[in-house]
């Protein structure tokens, strides 16, 4: 579980889906006066699920790939807190094809994850030289800046091209199970949304670099699949890409405790 401090004394937590139902039960035990989950008020919106305890504690939860009408249609309004937590966890862990593109200046990684838990089915990483900023002045600095701008542009085009290649291979069914997939008995699947073979696309790395790379026309078919969640990662090497499911599956919680 990852913790970060938010404004106003609130805290951001990242909770793995498998731990989420128990986390909600513990939240109820700490802040309620009845059986776990029974004392919590719950509000479901198109963006989040808010649990409010009798003592004023609030857990504002942002599940990944959230579709409230799909996940909680059968539980009434509002749904029971414990059942909702289990449904949210199940939805997060559902088998889906997730395209991932991680970009920082000079480095990039693209891949497709599938299965539950997600397995990296196809991937490609790369790097391009992008010089750091120069402290020199005058014409020398201007020439260096132009060279650096060209290097950065070429690197981001390479990142977009790599993602288009990887996602395209998946959509065309050209991917065959690797060792990990064979061990799990999984096969790549075509279909997805709008024939892309993907259900959702997640970006991460440097926001400015990702914004430019994702605007490349070759990635236009995937624009509508992009989620609002952005993955904060270091240089996108293969091990960083493999760790992406831990980030894109986490249920983000903004926890506000009552005054002491």
PLM regions with names:
Residues 1-260:
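Terminal alpha-helical anchor/extension segments at protein ends
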